[in-house]
């Protein structure tokens, strides 16, 4: 089966031209299909635009597939957010085909992509080139990927990684503080990344995405005002579903 070519990406870019986007992340290692279906339904009601499915540790094909199928019932597009080439499902709409820009491990820079490319082709998944940049806390993603997280107080380093990611073909530039991070990616890092990416002429072609550590409407609003196109939250949907709609609204209305 041929790989789907940018159909979902083009829809997301078109939707971004009308307003900011929010994605809800579900980790199959922590969430079974039953709960995943409930989280996805709540996310749709709260105004989320897509569901990301993936995790950094010990996720199997079967776990991923079950969660993807459950999340699809929400009516939202489901995008794989793989921690490795085993995080796959033919029922997903697309996969973030990501490179960890600040990893010291060749596996996460290119080897996982080589292993994952034929699988994406076989499953007919749309591959969305994604430059993944781990900032500050980093969480499990930073540890597993052997990343050198960008220090919170060095926004210019985040911006250089974002610019390089765009120049290397990334269509999603993802600044990640890590699941359960004590604080989000600094707005200064988002603003600096936005400025460089736009100056290089990639502004309308990429989605500057931020995730990790966002728990309040105020934090979401600050990231929006700094220039983020997409906000990703995961822990919030699992632990504080009542706050999700407020965070989504704050991000989209800023």
Swiss-Prot record:
Domain of life (superkingdom): Archaea
InterPro entries found in the cross-reference section: GGGP/HepGP_synthase_I (IPR039074), GGGP/HepGP_synthase_sf (IPR038597), GGGP_HepGP_synthase (IPR008205), GGGP_synth (IPR010946)
Residues reported to bind Mg(2+): 27, 56
GO cellular component, one term: cytoplasm
Annotated EC: 2.5.1.41
Gene3D superfamilies recorded: FMN-linked oxidoreductases (3.20.20.390)
Reaction(s) catalysed by this chain's protein: sn-glycerol 1-phosphate + (2E,6E,10E)-geranylgeranyl diphosphate = sn-3-O-(geranylgeranyl)glycerol 1-phosphate + diphosphate
Required cofactor(s): Mg(2+)
Compartment(s) of residence: Cytoplasm
Pathway where this protein functions: Membrane lipid metabolism; glycerophospholipid metabolism
Subunit composition and interactions: Homohexamer.
Family: Belongs to the GGGP/HepGP synthase family. Group II subfamily.
Function: Prenyltransferase that catalyzes the transfer of the geranylgeranyl moiety of geranylgeranyl diphosphate (GGPP) to the C3 hydroxyl of sn-glycerol-1-phosphate (G1P). This reaction is the first ether-bond-formation step in the biosynthesis of archaeal membrane lipids.
Name of the protein this chain belongs to: Geranylgeranylglyceryl phosphate synthase
